[in-house]
Amino acid sequence: MHLRTLLPLALAATAAFAQTAKVSPEKEASMKADLAGQIDAMKKQAQVMVDSVFSFGELGFQEFETSKYLSGILEKEGFKVERGLYGIPTSWVATWGSGKPVISLGSDIDDIPQASQKPAVGWHEPMIEGAPGHGEGHNSGVPLNIVAAIAVKRLMEREHLQGTIQLWPGVAEELVGAKAYFVKNGLFKNVDVVLFCHVANNLGVSWGPSLNQNGLVSIEYMFKGESAHAAGAPWRGKSALDAVELMDVGWNFRREHLRLAQRSHYVISNGGDQPNVVPPTASVWYYFREADYEHIMDLWQKGDNMAKGATLMTDTTFTSRLLGSAWPGHFNKAIAEDMYENIKKVGLPTWSDDDQKLAKGLQKELGVRVTGLATKIQEMRSPRLPQNTDAEGGGEGFGNQPTGGGSDDIGDVSWVVPTVTLRYPSNIPGGPGHNWANGVSMATPIAHKGVVAGAKVQAMTMVDILLHPGLVKAAWDYFNNVETKELKYKSFIRDQDKPAIWLNQKTMEQYRDRMKQYYYDPAKYDTYLEQLGIKYPTVR
């Protein structure tokens, strides 16, 4: 197509986008008030979705019930749904609308191994001993996005606003297993802004990089030796398990000489069959975390060297495979600042005495500071400043040096399109994370109220993006001229790597039939707590 043809098309597209901005401040305020009212009217739908996904309790890559349920709701609302993207059976993307801007909403859906917990009970009481459960709160984010998207869709239809809404789930986030494949395969190539959300204990948003979030690679090392009778002829065996243990010992000695920012941890994923057989196969699964791409790759190389050394000591061989990866995030200033204005408009939920009683009861049980639920919104976090550290250089922050921490593969998305993460207050302060305690509130009024508040913020920010082309322009200006000016995204995924969709399959097969007995039935029960016969709250 010639430039002479392209230019009028580009101008027409810009004009069509700009037309949506011709709204008075009074009209815009009225639209946002209408959105808040719509979302309040959808409280019941939000509660049902949150409770239903909590009851499914599915681990990463095995979120079949969850994905079917959530994508089905969007389909009934008129969204076009594509399922099973990029070789990941539980992935999907839902779209509605046409033209620019394209606003993409994402949140995670998987849960935590061995985190089964009765909601609203302020001590450890699993529904099924050893089963997975939502000990991170990922049952709430996509319901939040669905409520926001439906409300904005109705507003767009009524006001004849142009734009496209896209929704997708973060599959296997706890394995950092999917978003890098979404990026690599172009899910976000036409997207203008990504609004992600994640459960927290307050309303908040931040911009820039973070000193206490790492990227990572997830690598499994698989050793191969030779079996033998462990008592009758051990000299004829070559123990793959010995190789695993020697690699782990070597890595544990090396930790002393690694940077403060690094975090590394492992589990032995195959330790052999039984003691009287020299293990011919064994494997160990590592997470190597660091603050940037180069240092992550350095840890990966060090891990490979440890594995090679272990094989030399044991006359074994090894292969390895990438199971997941994540970049450290860098979040957009323009969108975060706009979102924070909407956070101030919405404010925190009004917590009941029972809400506070559950929070304080759980905090007392955990032996942490008893503060109850947050009653004041967080301030916008400064870029590159860690949470809960001494900004003057003492304490855990070590001045302006990376301190390390967890990882989330939304980081990969943030390096290809302007992205922010909304934190919403559905959890109780003081939980250790990845733990039964973080699931206590997640099918209670605390979670429901937090989702409704978050949906209002998400929806209002979407309207700002629809009405103000300059906001998208500012977002991309920051993305191009600050975030990616000197640092460009390079995927950890190699051509031979595939999504590790077999992970957690055996665990879910072990528990799924028993878990089905606890699936929420909203046709019979008003809430999941009613179905379970749990008094709200139940505390000591």
Language-model features, listed with the residues they occupy:
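Bacterial N-terminal signal peptides that target proteins for export
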Residues: 1-7
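Hydrophobic h-region of N-terminal signal peptides that target proteins for export
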Residues: 10-18, 42
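Acidic/His- and Gly-rich active-site-bordering loop/insert found
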Residues: 20-134, 143-164
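Divalent metal-coordination and catalytic microenvironments
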Residues: 53, 94, 105, 138, ...
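Structural recognition of the beta-strand scaffold that forms the well-ordered cores
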Residues: 82, 102-106, 166-169, 193-196, ...
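Acidic-glycine-rich active-site phosphate/pyrophosphate-binding loop
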Residues: 110-124, 212-222, 428-435
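Histidine/acidic-residue-rich, glycine-tolerant segments that coordinate divalent metal ions
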Residues: 124-133, 139-140, 157-279, 289, ...
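Metal-dependent amide/peptide-bond hydrolase catalytic core
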Residues: 245-540
